[in-house]
A protein has these predicted regions:
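N-terminal beta1-alpha1-beta2 module of alpha/beta enzyme domains
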Residues: 1-67, 71-72
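Glycine- and other small-residue-rich loops at beta-strand/loop junctions that grip anionic moieties
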Residues: 53, 77, 126
């Protein structure tokens, strides 16, 4: 029996934090995960998290693809009902190329009303939008 380990890089910081320094910290954590033999690195996604600051998921995954090679990079999770499917497909296809084919798409329907309001998408329609976007 074997087990693969994944490191989750939250990338969530208090207002006023030095985000350039935090980005370097995340890069170092990702490199350490690779050195320690982790199978993958997962990057979450949240919006409207004030007063907290976040790195955008796709930007962070692209950055990590340039920093760490030969490790799985995982969207954990992309909130698919909030986005246009073609845009998401192109973004993550690019990350897959940048990572040498090591990208894994994780998606979900979301649960925070503030994120749906911020994107102008009714939360009550998230299941329907998720299915439609997944099919597209």
């Amino acid at each position: 029996m074997s087990m693969d380990l994944i490191m989750v890089l939250r990338g969530q910081y208090n207002a006023g934090e030095d985000m350039a320094a935090r980005l370097e910290d995340l890069s170092n954590q990702a490199k350490l995960a690779k050195e320690l033999g982790y199978w993958g690195i997962a990057v979450p996604s949240h919006f409207s998290g004030a007063p907290l600051q976040y790195f955008h998921q796709t930007s962070m995954l692209a950055y990590l693809a340039a920093q760490v090679k030969d490790i799985k990079l995982i969207s954990a999770v992309n909130l698919l009902p909030l986005h246009k499917p073609m845009d998401i497909a192109e973004q993550y296809a690019s990350i897959d190329v940048m990572s040498g084919g090591n990208f894994i798409f994780g998606t979900g329907i979301g649960y925070r009303d503030v994120e749906f309001k911020g994107h102008g998408s009714p939360m009550a329609e998230r299941g329907k939008r998720f299915e439609e976007n997944l099919e597209a």
